[in-house]
């Protein structure tokens, strides 16, 4: 891994010796810059525009070269607002790609796409930096071991387990709980595994970014008293940023995660919320650069852009990056090119269902639509596999019977089917769980349920031992013992 040992002071002095160009055209966030003959910058080089606007305010805009147009002109995309820029302004070619701080100094801090801290906590140690554009690890460096990553969330661990060092997609429309699930995972992983996380906020709401930061400070994931003890680094490029920043902020977060994996040899969790916004920003940039759009108006380079990001997220013999990516599904259409391209890279999918959210079952993870390549007997063991398959069969049968129930009612079902429906409704409710990060909304304390406890609970429901308990006893509880205790309380209240 190439590390650039630069300090901010020396970076400026080396810039002075580089070649200068001038702005020839500005169209929103896209700049055309003319350079002297023979002094053209390379693709992905960072350009710096410095100067003053009409009211004398200092301007410092960093752009990234995207196209070489010929006639000594390059087209670059700005990483911040282009307000105040004028034609004829001087542009410096840095001679290298964007580099961002990496290592322990990033923990507990919030950065923008350029690796600049935006949390008003003072400067960050920039002695160790790394370029955001790097090639994926070679095949020979990759680690091929298969092991489960326990999350403490029942529905995930039982039916669609995550792979350590794998890529997981969180699919769902607006408002079904993707961000809450991500916050719970960060919380559980920091507490149960002591792992380092990097959170990339790509094109989402600034308010959510702020809420997440406050939540992390409250839960101790970010340690305010001793910032170096924190377990997460945050990189934000929010909805109000230009498309260039939203397109590159994922790479900034990934670069920080790669350092923890390759140099510190740690297991890292990389959260990207939302990978769809990465595609959306790429689509905006593609249109601004004048490329012909592809299906549904997306960029023609959609698969290439997605592949270059996803192939860097992998496990090597040094360490692993387990990535959890929220995927917004436009109009709940899973065949849209953005989610469809993302599917190709994933080891597991956690699909959130609006129907379950409407029933009040949280996390609203669809047990039949969510999948995992890890759910095989040779990986998870026979007991886990059998239990998961029986749970799915019971829920599938219930789904098939729902039309009959809606038209004819429960009484028209056979005795066996009525039993299946009763157990399926208990399973459906037992798949819900109180979250630590949602304690303020639900009023019930969060629960972390180990995999062995989860399997035991569902085996008891399937065996029929708990057929006599009311189904509401299984709603929003942790392990099965809590459900039986809740049933006794409900009985006591009736008397």
Curated annotation (Swiss-Prot):
Q: Which residues bind ATP?
A: 172-179
InterPro entries given in the database record: AAA+_ATPase (IPR003593), ATP-synt_VA_C (IPR055190), ATP_synth_F1_bsu (IPR005722), ATPase_a/bsu_AS (IPR020003), ATPase_alpha/beta_chains (IPR050053), ATPase_F1/V1/A1_a/bsu_N (IPR004100), ATPase_F1/V1/A1_a/bsu_N_sf (IPR036121), ATPase_F1/V1/A1_a/bsu_nucl-bd (IPR000194)
Membrane topology category: Peripheral membrane protein
Its Enzyme Commission number(s) read 7.1.2.2
Please state where this protein is localized: Plastid, Chloroplast thylakoid membrane
First-tier enzyme category under EC: translocase
Q: Which GO terms describe its cellular component?
A: chloroplast thylakoid membrane; mitochondrion; proton-transporting ATP synthase complex
Q: Which domain of life is it from?
A: Eukaryota
The record ties this protein, via SMART domains, to: AAA (SM00382)
Q: Where are the transmembrane segments?
A: none
> Do you know which HAMAP family this protein is assigned to?
ATP_synth_beta_bact
Family under the similarity heading: Belongs to the ATPase alpha/beta chains family.
What quaternary structure, including any partners, is listed in this protein's UniProt entry?
F-type ATPases have 2 components, CF(1) - the catalytic core - and CF(0) - the membrane proton channel. CF(1) has five subunits: alpha(3), beta(3), gamma(1), delta(1), epsilon(1). CF(0) has four main subunits: a(1), b(1), b'(1) and c(9-12).
Q: What does this protein do?
A: Produces ATP from ADP in the presence of a proton gradient across the membrane. The catalytic sites are hosted primarily by the beta subunits.
| PANTHER family membership | ATP SYNTHASE, ATP SYNTHASE SUBUNIT BETA, MITOCHONDRIAL
Please report the name of this protein according to its UniProt entry. ATP synthase subunit beta, chloroplastic
**Organism the protein comes from:** Barnardia japonica
Q: Which gene encodes it?
A: atpB
């Amino acid at each position: 891994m190439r590390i650039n040992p630069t300090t901010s002071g020396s970076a400026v002095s080396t810039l002075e010796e580089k070649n200068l160009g001038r702005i020839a055209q500005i169209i929103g966030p896209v700049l055309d810059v003319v350079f002297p003959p023979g002094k053209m910058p390379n693709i992905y080089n960072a350009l710096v525009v410095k100067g003053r606007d009409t009211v004398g305010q200092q301007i410092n805009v960093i752009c990234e070269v995207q196209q070489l147009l010929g006639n000594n002109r390059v087209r670059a995309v700005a990483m911040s607002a282009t307000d105040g820029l004028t034609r004829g302004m001087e542009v410096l070619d840095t001679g290298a790609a964007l580099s961002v701080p990496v290592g322990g100094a990033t923990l507990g801090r919030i950065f923008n796409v350029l690796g600049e801290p935006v949390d008003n906590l003072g400067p960050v140690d920039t002695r160790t930096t790394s370029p955001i554009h790097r090639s994926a690890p070679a095949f020979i460096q990759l680690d091929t071991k298969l092991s489960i990553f326990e999350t403490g969330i029942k529905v995930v661990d039982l039916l669609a387990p995550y792979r350590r060092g794998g890529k997981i997609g969180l699919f769902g429309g607006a408002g079904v709980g993707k961000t809450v699930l991500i916050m719970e995972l960060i919380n559980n992983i920091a507490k149960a595994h002591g792992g380092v996380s990097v959170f990339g906020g790509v094109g989402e709401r600034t308010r959510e970014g702020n809420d997440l930061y406050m939540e992390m400070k409250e839960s101790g994931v970010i340690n305010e008293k001793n910032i170096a003890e924190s377990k997460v680094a945050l990189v934000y490029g929010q909805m109000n940023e230009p498309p260039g920043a939203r397109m590159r902020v994922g790479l900034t977060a990934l670069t920080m995660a790669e350092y923890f994996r390759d140099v510190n040899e740690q297991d890292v969790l990389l959260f990207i919320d939302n990978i769809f916004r990465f595609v959306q920003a790429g689509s905006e940039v593609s249109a601004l650069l004048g490329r012909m759009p592809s299906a549904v108006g997306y960029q023609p380079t959609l698969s290439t852009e997605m592949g270059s990001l996803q192939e860097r997220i992998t496990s090597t013999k040094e360490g692993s990056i387990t990535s959890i990516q929220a995927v917004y599904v436009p109009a709940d259409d899973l065949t849209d090119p953005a989610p469809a391209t993302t599917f190709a890279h994933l080891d597991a999918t956690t699909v959130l269902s609006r129907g379950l959210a409407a029933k009040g079952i949280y996390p609203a993870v669809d047990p039949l639509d969510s999948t995992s390549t890890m759910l095989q007997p040779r990986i998870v063991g026979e007991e886990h596999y059998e239990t998961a398959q029986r749970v799915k069969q019971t829920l599938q049968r219930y789904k098939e019977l729902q039309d009959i129930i809606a038209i004819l009612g429960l009484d028209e079902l056979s005795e066996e089917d009525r039993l299946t429906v009763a157990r399926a409704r208990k399973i459906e409710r037992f798949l819900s769980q109180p979250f630590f990060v949602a304690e303020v909304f639900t009023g019930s304390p969060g629960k972390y349920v180990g995999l062995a406890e989860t399997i035991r609970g569902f085996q008891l429901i399937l065996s029929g031992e708990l057929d006599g308990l009311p189904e509401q006893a299984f709603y929003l509880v942790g392990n099965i013992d809590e459900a039986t205790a809740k049933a006794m309380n409900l009985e006591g209240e009736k008397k």
